[in-house]
Amino acid sequence: NNDDSTFMVTDKVYDRAMPLDINDKGQVFEPKDVGAQDINYSYLDKLFTEAIENNPISQDSLDKIEVMDNYVIQHFRIAFGNRIVAHMKKFVPVFVACGGTEVDGVDYFIARKILRKFEQLNVAYIRDEIDGFVKFLNDEFGEGKMAECIEYLLRLKNIHNGKKVIIK
């Protein structure tokens, strides 16, 4: 919950949850009529365990994340801890098992669990660092591969520049 009456969600809540941001209005559609499907906890837990075993996050990605962590510490004075990395090691394999790619899972996770901490900073102070960070992400992970992170960073920068930004 983050609305007009709740100005901030604590780190503890974010660290234990996976936020879903709904920034755009959905398209109207007619859903297909499908029957209910019961899934109990043990079955879902089994699927998660299989996903983690079959799709572990690569050492290459973990190395890039460590380099990124050091960059963020140096330029923004924000660090993320072992709990975040442990959560990422569970989230990304499940993301891959659901049909996504590893880099897209890392991108989604970082944008929602790490970069959201930038909102707590004085954006006037960090605004000049954002372009360098976007370049770093493109250099480290591949041009345009960290699209969620880059979109978030540019939106943050432009909102505080007084510009309205529309990113497609």
Give, region by region, the residue ranges found by the protein language model.
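C-terminal regulatory/interaction module of P-loop NTP-utilizing enzymes
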Residues: 1-168
